[in-house]
Amino acid sequence: SCELHNSKKSKDDEFLMTCMAGVVGNNFLGYFHTHTKVKRAIIRKGQAFRNTILEEIQETHFKNENGVSFPVLIGRPNFDRLYSCFKNIAYGLYYHKFGKRFEGESQIMMDFLTFEDEQTEKIKLLVRKRLEEETEKPEIEGANPEIFSYAFYRPDEFGLISLVMTFYQGSKVLVAFKETGIKEPFNLTMKLINSGVKTHVEFDDGTDFEFN
């Protein structure tokens, strides 16, 4: 049982590094890992392994803000496996932070992905903006922040806890924890959005999100 668990964890660690290291916008260490550890894994395991990371792969070029063009791969990630990895990490961090197992419901948003569905993409950007606008900034934790760091926000007025996990200083995963016994607050904005009503969400800096 222990060997099976360790084997699965090792495979998940390799899968996660392969997925995350090369995301556009990450730091130099992510780029370095992509061209060393990740490249060796792909060469060793072949095309079948690459297909477990991305499906419908397209090779293209991306031009950064400095006008430098470099090759990238675009495709559909293994969403379910990524979700499972991020959930395991988030629950482990919750236990480490609060000294107890998390019991309740959680929601995970992969901020580093670009979603084909326009509404999902806008909701992602809205959640990102709201966290950026928080006046009380959380403590950033992690022994090796160039590879991974995380930050827990203080519980809001409803008792909901937000967590931001950052890989290679560029790829963020947003997690919301709702412990058992906490009543989910009524959210008029999301109710209107989900009902198909045209909705605007505006911020003090003039940023405006339009839905439907």
Language model region names:
Residues 5, 33-35, 61, 96, ...:
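Histidine (H) residue identity feature
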Residues 7, 30-45:
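Short Fe-S-cluster ligation motifs
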Residues 21-26:
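Intrinsically disordered, low-complexity regulatory regions of eukaryotic proteins
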Residues 2-20:
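Short Cys/His-centered divalent metal-binding micro-motifs
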Residues 16, 28-31:
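N-terminal accessory/assembly segment that mediates macromolecular interactions
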Residues 67-212:
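C-terminal, charged low-complexity interaction regions
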Residues 38-79:
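Short flanking/linker segments adjacent to small metal-binding domains or redox-active Cys/His motifs
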